[in-house]
Amino acid sequence: MTNTQTRVIKQINKTILATCSFIFLFGFFLSSATSTILIQTNEWSILTAAILISIVELFNYLKHKFQFNDRKSGYNCFFFINLAKLGLLYGLFIDAFKLGS
């Protein structure tokens, strides 16, 4: 590999890392916004949890139904949605610890 190719690959890797970090933190933000806005009244808490779990399980079903072994065009979409899902679940997990303490 030439020096130019190495620099291009390093720049692409930095861009991918920044994009993945942004999407994960966006999922974390969604969990904070969801728990702050929709769960202010006690009537919405069970419905909100059921909807979020349904969305996560639907995504898991679709991901395992269309398993992407190679890097097709749909792979990146599922990868980024999975990162947002992980951020969402991590944020809800952290909120549960905050409520428990």
Curated annotation (Swiss-Prot):
| Record keywords | Chloroplast, Plastid
Checking Pfam families in the record gives: DUF565 (PF04483)
Keyword Chloroplast recorded = yes
What does the entry list under GO cellular component?
Answer: chloroplast
The entry assigns this protein to a family as follows:
Belongs to the ycf20 family.
Q: Where in the cell is it found?
A: Plastid, Chloroplast
- Which residue ranges does UniProt annotate as crossing the membrane? none
Q: What is the lineage of its organism?
A: Eukaryota, Rhodophyta, Bangiophyceae, Cyanidiales, Cyanidiaceae
Please identify the protein, giving its name as recorded: Uncharacterized protein ycf20
